[in-house]
Each structure stands twice: as C-alpha cells, then as structure tokens.
C-alpha cells in the first residue's frame, strides 16, 4: 500500500492536481512545495507526526489541499464548518486535537472552543492557484 506522499510523488510536476472554476490549477509540483511548507509551519508551531490537527474550512480546493498536505505531517481530522459550539467541543475533546486550522478572520464556534481548550489555532490564508495557501499562528 502506498503512502499519500508516494502517490503525489508519482505524478509529473506539471500535471494538474487541484482545480476550481475560475481559478488557475494547482500542479503536482505546487502541491509538493505546499506539502513541505505545511510541514515546516506545523513543526514550527510545535506539531509533530503523532499530533492531531482538526481542519475547519469550507468545502473547496483549500480544504482538499489542507487535508492532503497536513495528513503527510500529522493526523488530520476535517470537521464540518456548520457544527455548533457544543458539537465542536465534543469532537475536539474526543479527538484530543493539539491544533485547529481555520480561515484567516474566522471567529466562529470552532475558534472559541479551541481557545477554551488551549489549542494551537492556525490560520489559513488562501492564495492562487486553487488550493494554494499559507499558514500562520
């Protein structure tokens, strides 16, 4: 069975990987670079391979890219952005997540629960091409 990283490495750098209507395609080369950048950002935030990271983002190319890249550096748990505060509290506590990734500027129930649980909050800022982003704490 191949690991996710191996599956990505098997594609030519110029091949399209992630797209969205009206946006440029992210290539596999872009995805490989993003994977390294995400790993560096997570390690700088104190997140290791055995840690759990919840992702609370709208469906779309950034969610897809975040899942694929974070999963290569930590255990990843995508959560539904529509959850209410008590649902986030249940899932984040059950997961024992060390960190949560949210969109820059998001101030909803997931962030409030993460702060209550003293989790690391990582903000994702989308850019171009589709799926591309930066992370900051």
Model-derived segments and their meaning:
Residues 68-69, 113:
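Hydrophobic/aromatic ligand-binding patch that stacks against planar heteroaromatic rings
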Residues 12, 60-61, 104:
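Alpha-helix N-cap/helix-start capping motif
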Residues 44-45, 74-137:
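Structural core segment of the AMP-binding/adenylate-forming
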Residues 1-17:
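A short N-terminal helical cap/helix-turn-helix that marks the beginning
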Residues 16-60, 64-68, 84-89, 137:
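Conserved AMP-binding/adenylate-forming core of the ANL superfamily
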Residues 8-11, 22, 29, 123-128, ...:
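Residues at the C-termini of beta-strands that transition into short coil/loop
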